[in-house]
């Protein structure tokens, strides 16, 4: 296996893991970075693998919590509510994704759309942060979330179907806008990523499994492990960060990155295939 290809697969896995749980759009970063370093492996299969690696980082980080929930379902009220909230939050985006997946990829998966959503999302984060700084959040614990709170976060997640919006960005900001404390909204976003990304991965596997070849196994494993490790680091770091600070730095980053995408696209440095 060529060392340069291995290095590129490693870098792509790291990009996925570090950006998946930050409100900065992992999709945009993977496309731009993949173009810049010339990574042209079996794209969709590789993407599925690194997304799975990233989501398993959340499962590992919260393994005790998920274990308690699994053992408590049907017996423990707190576990039942947790599962119910995840199910409620999961449904809106899952339904809309199944209904409009083809149209979204056909009409919205382009550099202009992604760049615009990055910039608009950046300004939206600035507005939400300014709003929360003026009002005391009503909910400061994941276990205190009600089904209606989960539904509002789920509705917000629908916007993440538009490339460039960011799943974590839409769910966290949607939660904060609804009156949920920043760290609590972030944690619930992590939890919601598990069923959402597992379902998306399963859907993509059914669509693209025929493109898998044994030749890709090595690169897939490298990307998977890199995404898992970097995702674990990102989850820990983000929780620590939002415990003391806000999301404003990410807002400015999004705005700049959106402009960079337009420049790179117009200059021919990146393609969108």
UniProtKB/Swiss-Prot annotation:
Instruction: Report the Pfam families cross-referenced here.
Output: BacA (PF02673)
Q: How does it sit in the membrane?
A: Multi-pass membrane protein
Q: Which reaction(s) does its UniProt entry say it catalyses?
A: di-trans,octa-cis-undecaprenyl diphosphate + H2O = di-trans,octa-cis-undecaprenyl phosphate + phosphate + H(+)
What are the recorded Gene Ontology BP terms? cell wall organization; peptidoglycan biosynthetic process; regulation of cell shape; response to antibiotic
Q: Which GO terms describe its cellular component?
A: plasma membrane
Domain of life, per UniProt, equals Bacteria
Q: Which compartments is it annotated to reside in?
A: Cell inner membrane
The GO molecular function terms of this record are: undecaprenyl-diphosphatase activity
Primary localization class, coarse:
membrane
Q: What is its EC number?
A: 3.6.1.27
Task: List where the protein spans the membrane.
Answer: 13-35, 45-62, 82-102, 108-128, 186-206, 219-239, 250-270
Keywords recorded for this protein, A-Z: Antibiotic resistance, Cell inner membrane, Cell membrane, Cell shape, Cell wall biogenesis/degradation, Hydrolase, Membrane, Peptidoglycan synthesis, Transmembrane, Transmembrane helix
User: Coiled coil where?
Assistant: none
Is Cell wall biogenesis/degradation given among the entry's keywords?
Answer: yes
Q: What else is known?
A: Bacitracin is thought to be involved in the inhibition of peptidoglycan synthesis by sequestering undecaprenyl diphosphate, thereby reducing the pool of lipid carrier available.
Q: Give the family per the record.
A: Belongs to the UppP family.
Identify the HAMAP family for this entry: Undec_diphosphatase
Task: Give the protein's function.
Answer: Catalyzes the dephosphorylation of undecaprenyl diphosphate (UPP). Confers resistance to bacitracin.
Q: What is this protein called?
A: Undecaprenyl-diphosphatase
Q: Which organism is it from?
A: Neisseria gonorrhoeae (strain ATCC 700825 / FA 1090)
Q: What is the lineage of its organism?
A: Bacteria, Pseudomonadati, Pseudomonadota, Betaproteobacteria, Neisseriales
Report which gene this protein is encoded by.
uppP
